[in-house]
Amino acid sequence: MMIKVKKETMRACLSCSICDNILRDATTISECLHTFCRKCIYEKITEDEIETCPVCNIDLGSTPLEKLRPDHNLQDLRAKIFALKRRKVKAPGIVSLPGKRKERSISSLVVSTPMVSAQAGTTRRRTKAPTRKELRNGSLAERTVKKEESSGDELLESTSSPDTLNKFTQNKRQSKKSCKESISNKENKDGDEPWDSKMDWKPLNFLVEVANGTKPLKSSASQGSGSKSEHANVSRNQFQGSKTKTKNKKRKCKREDDKSNNGDPTTSETVTPKRMRTTQRKRSATTLGDSRNLPQPDESSAKQERRNGPVWFSLVASNDQEGGTSLPQIPANFLRIRDGNTTVSFIQKYLMRKLDLESENEIEIKCMGEAVIPTLTLYNLVDLWLQKSSNHQRFAALVGSSAKDFTMVLVYARKLPECNM
């Protein structure tokens, strides 16, 4: 639905309150939503140093420029209603290029050119490059010649009379002749040696021969640097000597081992060190099969296991108890004590509680028919039981079978009163 609205009413809505013109780059304050031209509001804030809105004086904080936002909707509406007037620029007319002029060379402009420079360039002979010594000695003469040439060129530019040109060419020729004579005299003094003979071609020839593979590297190194090769040979000989020494030592050790294995202990003991002797003793003990040495580690290991592990034993009431009433058999006759360092008096206290006795001194414990001291530890008691058992025999047992035949048996009975004489 189309509605006709006057431009004046729209102009009032789309105009800036600072410059009273139609908005250009509409910019709105986010706090109060008043819209201005971007240029106008920026200049107002920065130049007048205000921190409030120019219309409603609302506070914009310490950074008012951050509260400004571009309003694209108003800008699009302004572009549709009040289109920007574009200036019509007249197209530039066709500029006619000037006619081409004939270019003249620089040589045609010069009236007279001196012929001395051309003659000097053509009459110079090509000579071989001089050595460093010649360059050092002839540097002063060349500098003087260059100075004269530069001064001569300046004179040529300034003067063009034939008399001055002739004088200059004569002076220049004389200076060149003197310079050549001095260089030739120095060459004669050096001994008329050719330039090629003075050059040292040895390193280049050596590189060519090495690249072609015709000459070995060792011979050239020995000829070129004698001191370095001698030093390298000495170090190689020392390294080879140390290698041979270590090899000889290894061979000697192997021979001594072979002799000791064959049965010559006297010779090996006199020559071999202490470490070799200990290893030979161990080998001889294992090879000969000495029965006395073999069970020793087993016994020590078994003893160590007994010292660390618990102690199993069985308590049995004595059948032939003299005197008063005999002690009954306790129900749990197989017992285990974790700490083997406990004394026999601990077993006496256990029996006193089980049998309801008044004192532990009423009980006497025997092992293998002999009375046991109450202060004796269980580990020592096990050692005594093993010593008195039958000939240290080994018995085969299956895993899970009864250990009744392998446990220590302790017999308890009522202690007889001591008779006072």
Curated annotation (Swiss-Prot):
Keywords: Metal-binding, Nucleus, Transferase, Ubl conjugation, Ubl conjugation pathway, Zinc, Zinc-finger. It catalyses: S-ubiquitinyl-[E2 ubiquitin-conjugating enzyme]-L-cysteine + [acceptor protein]-L-lysine = [E2 ubiquitin-conjugating enzyme]-L-cysteine + N(6)-ubiquitinyl-[acceptor protein]-L-lysine. It holds the Pfam family zf-C3HC4_2. It is an enzyme of class 2 (transferase). SUPFAM superfamilies: RING/U-box. Residues 106-121, 157-172, 262-271, 285-294 have a biased composition (Polar residues). One of its GO terms (molecular function) is zinc ion binding. A zinc finger (RING-type) spans 16-57. This is E3 ubiquitin protein ligase DRIP1. The gene is DRIP1.
